[in-house]
């Protein structure tokens, strides 16, 4: 059937130039599944529309199974404290198409899920971060390979002048890098660690393994952007984390209580 519609009104597929799909829609499980599968080349995402409108703006995009929101918020705070016109959008902050009064100097920090990236065709980021990958959302993606591919759309669409910051100790990230050639400059968080700077950070929030890892990503971005280290240190010292995500709710010499109830 080449027609879709509700009630008595039918619309032919020829009337569509583009289909902007919501991230929550799985084309394999929806009422329009047959129609959408026939028209995959016409499907775009909100990230694609966003990129088409703000192609010249600097974009830093974070994805991964865990730690996306926290890392995005730290990076947003860091850039804001450095007096940048920075916007926090995507899965955290405002929807990507809701920002107003955007100028050429506006920087976007974007949290992107696998759902948002899966069908994207145009979107690309100047700096991409893949924090980690572990089996998740397989009810949607069906296989771990498809889930990894959705995450790596972020890197696949980048050019040689872009940066991909990756945790190459992660099994799935390492395997993907070894099996394909990607264009951007790959920066491994395990390499060239600024231990002298790390020693200056006196914030118990970064004592957990996950947050130590997130911190390494922040430092790599800071190096690429040549951020002021004194300002960076001040921001990191005062960061308290997001609620329910490795949130320290009590701390003493003998006991630390962490609320990580957001963890899935």
Regions found by a protein language model. Name each.
Residues 1-45, 49, 227:
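N-terminal leader/targeting and accessory segments in enzymes
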Residues 3-6, 44-49, 181-196, 233-237, ...:
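Beta-strand->loop->alpha-helix junctions that form or flank phosphate-binding loops
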Residues 6, 42-46, 86-91, 109-110, ...:
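General beta-strand structural signal in soluble alpha/beta enzymes
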Residues 19, 62, 91, 131, ...:
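Residue-level signal for inorganic ion chemistry
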Residues 36-40, 46-90:
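Walker A (P-loop) phosphate-binding motif
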Residues 84-104:
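Conserved substrate/cofactor phosphate-moiety recognition/catalytic segment
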Residues 85, 204-264:
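Nucleotide phosphate-binding/pyrophosphate-handling subdomain across enzymes
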Residues 102-188, 193-207:
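Flexible active-site lid/hinge loop adjacent to a nucleotide/diphosphate
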């Amino acid at each position: 059937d080449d027609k879709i519609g509700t009630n008595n009104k039918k619309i032919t597929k020829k009337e569509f130039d583009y289909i902007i799909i919501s991230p929550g829609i799985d084309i394999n499980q929806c009422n329009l599944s047959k129609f959408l599968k026939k028209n995959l080349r016409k499907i775009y995402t909100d990230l694609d529309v966003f990129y088409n409108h703000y192609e010249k703006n600097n974009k830093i995009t974070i994805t991964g199974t865990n730690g996306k929101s926290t890392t995005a918020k730290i990076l947003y705070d860091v850039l804001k404290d450095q007096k940048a016109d920075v916007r926090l959008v995507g899965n955290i902050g405002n929807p990507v198409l809701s920002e107003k009064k955007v100028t050429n100097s506006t920087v976007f920090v974007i949290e992107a899920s696998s759902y948002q990236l899966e069908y994207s065709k145009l979107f690309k980021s100047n700096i991409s971060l893949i924090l980690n990958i572990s089996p998740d959302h397989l009810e949607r993606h069906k296989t771990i390979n498809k889930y990894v591919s959705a995450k790596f759309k972020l890197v696949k669409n980048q050019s040689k002048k872009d940066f991909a910051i990756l945790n190459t100790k992660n099994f799935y990230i390492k395997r993907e890098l070894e099996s394909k050639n990607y264009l951007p400059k790959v920066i491994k968080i395990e390499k060239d660690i600024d231990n002298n700077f790390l020693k200056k950070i006196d914030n118990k929030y970064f004592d957990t393994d996950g947050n130590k890892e997130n911190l390494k990503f922040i430092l790599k971005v800071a190096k690429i952007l040549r951020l002021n280290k004194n300002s960076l240190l001040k921001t990191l010292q005062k960061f308290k984390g997001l609620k329910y995500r490795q949130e320290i709710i009590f701390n003493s010499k003998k006991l630390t209580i962490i609320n990580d109830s957001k963890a899935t």
